[in-house]
Amino acid sequence: MPSLPVLDHDAVLAAVSPLEAIARVRDALVRFHLDEWTMPAKVYMESPPFGDFRAMPARGDGLALLKWVTSFPGNPVNGLPVVTGVVCVSSAIDGQPLMLLDARSVTALRTGAVAAVAADALARGRGTVGIIGCGLHGAWAARCLAAAGYGPGVCHDPRPDAANALAAELDWDPGSREQALRCEVVCCVTPGLQIVVEAGDLRPGLHLNMLGADGPGKSEASIGAVASCALFCDEWEQASHGGELTAAIEAGIVSRDRVTELGAVLAGDAPGRPGPESVTLFDSTGLAIQDLAVAAAALEAWREGRVEAQTVRL
């Protein structure tokens, strides 16, 4: 077998700019809605009480992808990242492996990109940004929104150093949770182990990107807050079983007809924001088609000589 290119964390981020990631993720959501891309269900394997593993496949545009990724929320106390893993991209024509990529960077970049895609489709305009949770994914949500023309912003994190560093990078301000929630576009990017948005925090015209609750039992918004919003998600089956909407669905407060998939809005097949005073909530559980969009862009960058890769022989 020929040598296989491998992109590490820094190489992935050098290969794909925030604006390219945004465009690629937007296109992937539309293509999936139109049944041009395929995505079997995500598989979870619990590793209690520490975290979980996920296997995420997708196929589109002649490529097939499998992401093997983890979520171990307690890792930072041991100096380890919460999310780690590997992405394998293969040819969907002959099955040959084409590239291996660091899953942490791919996940962070597509998570940030979908925050900007959702804001463009659902927010009232390119206004101020509140970031609640300034870890890797929160930082990339902020960077992608800034690249798309949003801001200025307020960065909040229980770790002041994280909020201060991100705010300094973007020339935004560190602030409290309440200050972040007063912004026009609010991104919640926490582990999803405690509520950070209550019904009383909602204001007319607010758009919420809920990016942290990416598995069963996780929530960043109270059921009352969720029930008060116009609801959107990345993909219904995944969001209804392991996302921000799950608790409200299980309580019988939210049903399928209340939730619109973002791809349908982007394709022009469903309405977006009901009105300027509405509060919109986008539940992002993270899709393999988004990983494929970013990985395909990175593969293209390597083939065109815009990024260097390590190589391995299998």
Feature-to-residue mapping (PLM):
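N-terminal ligand-binding/catalytic initiation module
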Residues: 1-107, 116, 289, 299-300, ...
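Short helix-loop-beta connector
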Residues: 122-129, 150, 203-204
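Conserved beta-strand elements of the Class I
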Residues: 129-130, 280
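Glycine-rich Rossmann-fold phosphate-binding loop(s) that bind the pyrophosphate
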Residues: 133-135
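N-terminal Rossmann-fold NAD(P) dinucleotide-binding loop
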Residues: 138-139
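NAD(P)-binding Rossmann-fold cofactor-contacting core
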Residues: 148-169
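Rossmann-like adenosine-cofactor binding region
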Residues: 171-253
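Adenosine-phosphate binding glycine-rich loop
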Residues: 216-314
